[in-house]
Amino acid sequence: MSLDLDQVVADAQAAFAAANDNATLENEKARFLGKTGALTELLKGLGKLDPDARKTEGARINQVKQQVEAALQARRQALADALMNARLAAEAIDVTLPGRSVARGSVHPVMRTWERVEQIFGSIGFDVADGPEIETDWMNFTALNNPDNHPARSMQDTFYVDGRDSDDKLLLLRTHTSPMQVRYARMHVEKYAGRAMPPIKVICPGRTYRVDSDATHSPMFNQVEGLWIGDNVSFADLKGVYTDFLRKFFERDDIQVRFRPSYFPFTEPSAEIDMAFGNGKWLEISGSGQVHPNVLRNMGLDPERYIGFAFGSGLERLTMLRYGINDLRLFFEGDVRFLRQFA
């Protein structure tokens, strides 16, 4: 029995030490400590001994069992430590390696213009309004005094959307941000119903859509429109506000601006706003005018009491002039080489 016990301990220690993974180790455990293991068989043999020998050998077998279990636990810990060390080695960071630069994004040049326009007009008391890009035919055209036979209503100029709204009105992708002015004015009038109404001063930047595409036009473009309505707002106010805006936007005090008579259905009188460039050249930069009485009525205002002006400019046009870009399509191609210049 003594020889058997010593051999069991030696065999168990050798078997556990040879196990290179947990599955093998568990198999070896079963060989020595399982229901049919070597120690279990020795315990079964105690019944053949006399009481005194059974007591002595039982104590020795339990001592051997503890030695085997200790060897098993030590090997388990060794395997766990080896696995952890391997993981740490695989995930180790070499602090002597040079650092990796983090890719840095930047604001798109058109969005730079958008934010700059909001900041400039915000500094003189204009709110910023937002509205849906899918508009009703009424909001986009009728409310703005566009007649039913106006060319802008044709499918050659406007993207119409299948279906109608809850009032059975035609739906389309807005061709300008003027509908936002109408929506804002109507909410303003409703808000101050029955009490003194402060002037309406708002700009409406946003995406707009028209069936057009070339070096200076895109089927989707960004526009900002402004509206100022009050008891005594004149064309002189329009000239002062927009001229001041251009000088702040381009950071030049010597900018020359002219207002050239034009026609828009939603303003009367109307004017194109041109900005002077070198060699006596002028470039159209905005459309503007005094808000038409019919538009004021559609806003819920009395044209006999209220008067105001509106203007609209393309954000891409302003961006092209500010940065000297000659092709509108560059803004939409996602060319990192181009965009990186504005980072």
UniProtKB/Swiss-Prot annotation:
An example of a GO molecular function for this protein is: ATP binding
- Report the GO terms under cellular component: cytoplasm
PROSITE patterns, per the entry: AA_TRNA_LIGASE_II
Annotated GO biological process: phenylalanyl-tRNA aminoacylation
What InterPro entries does its record include?
aa-tRNA-synth_II, aa-tRNA-synth_II/BPL/LPL, Phe-tRNA-synth_IIc_asu, Phe-tRNA_ligase_II_N, Phe_tRNA_ligase_alpha1_bac, Phenylalanyl-tRNA_Synthase, tRNA-bd_arm
Annotated Mg(2+) binding lies at 268
Q: What class of enzyme is it?
A: ligase
Recorded catalytic activity of this chain's protein: tRNA(Phe) + L-phenylalanine + ATP = L-phenylalanyl-tRNA(Phe) + AMP + diphosphate + H(+)
Tell me the keywords, alphabetical order: Aminoacyl-tRNA synthetase, ATP-binding, Cytoplasm, Ligase, Magnesium, Metal-binding, Nucleotide-binding, Protein biosynthesis
Q: How is the cofactor bound?
A: Binds 2 magnesium ions per tetramer.
Needs which cofactor?
Mg(2+)
| Compartment(s) where it occurs, according to its Swiss-Prot or TrEMBL record | Cytoplasm
Identify the EC number(s).
6.1.1.20
| Subunit relationships | Tetramer of two alpha and two beta subunits.
Family (UniProt): Belongs to the class-II aminoacyl-tRNA synthetase family. Phe-tRNA synthetase alpha subunit type 1 subfamily.
What is the recorded name of this protein?
Answer: Phenylalanine--tRNA ligase alpha subunit
Traced from the root, the source organism's taxonomic lineage reads: Bacteria, Pseudomonadati, Pseudomonadota, Betaproteobacteria, Burkholderiales
